[in-house]
């Protein structure tokens, strides 16, 4: 199940977001302090982390920067009533925030933004898996190439196949 972390110092905001997101089939974890949210990062792997921009002990960008170090694949969103341009730029540049959502929010926009973030998260994971598969296949090909080179050096001509004009493999001495 896809896990989402919500961090906001206002319990009413967390409750409203949980009610909005739970019906989507996502596992929603809510934290009303940065400290408790940090513990959540150690216990769970999140696809999406949504943080309030302004909280008493730390701002959301600072928290999301830390979250990025702990869970680099998780998509990060900021939710804020303070949607000034400099806040957005700071969030994007420092925490590589995927999206900046404003309070009060539009339910459809929040759900669509989180779904889009989840889709991107899954693509990132799939991309990594495919890169790992390609790397493994390249390593296997290099090993086979080394084996062919070894065989060729021990038995010159062993790796060459002689074919007739119709594609049939010819067996025997065909040098003359």
Question: What is the meaning of each model-derived region?
Answer:
Residues 30-48:
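Acidic, metal-coordinating helix/loop segments flanking the phosphotransfer/catalytic sites
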Residues 32-33, 59-62:
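Acidic catalytic/metal-coordinating carboxylates
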Residues 105-114, 118, 122:
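C-terminal output helix
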Residues 39, 61-73, 90:
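Short amphipathic alpha-helix used as the core "switch/output" element in two-component signaling
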Residues 55:
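Receiver (REC) domain active-site loop signature in two-component systems and cognate sites
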Residues 129-176:
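C-terminal output/effector regions of signal-responsive regulators
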């Amino acid at each position: 199940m896809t896990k989402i972390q919500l961090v906001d110092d206002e319990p009413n905001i967390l409750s409203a977001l949980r009610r909005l997101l739970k019906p989507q089939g996502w596992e929603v974890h809510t934290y009303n302090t940065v400290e408790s949210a940090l513990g959540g990062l150690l216990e769970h792997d999140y696809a999406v982390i949504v943080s309030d921009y302004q909280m008493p002990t730390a701002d959301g960008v600072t928290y999301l920067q830390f979250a990025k170090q702990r869970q680099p694949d998780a998509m990060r969103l900021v939710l804020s009533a303070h949607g000034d341009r400099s806040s957005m730029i700071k969030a994007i540049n420092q925490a590589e925030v995927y999206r900046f959502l404003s309070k009060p929010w539009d339910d459809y926009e929040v759900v669509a933004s989180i779904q889009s973030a989840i889709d991107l998260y899954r693509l990132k994971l799939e991309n990594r898996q495919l890169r790992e598969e390609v790397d493994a296949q390249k390593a296997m090909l290099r090993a086979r190439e080394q084996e062919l080179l070894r065989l060729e050096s021990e038995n010159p001509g062993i790796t060459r196949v002689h074919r007739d004009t119709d594609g049939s493999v010819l067996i025997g001495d065909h040098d003359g």
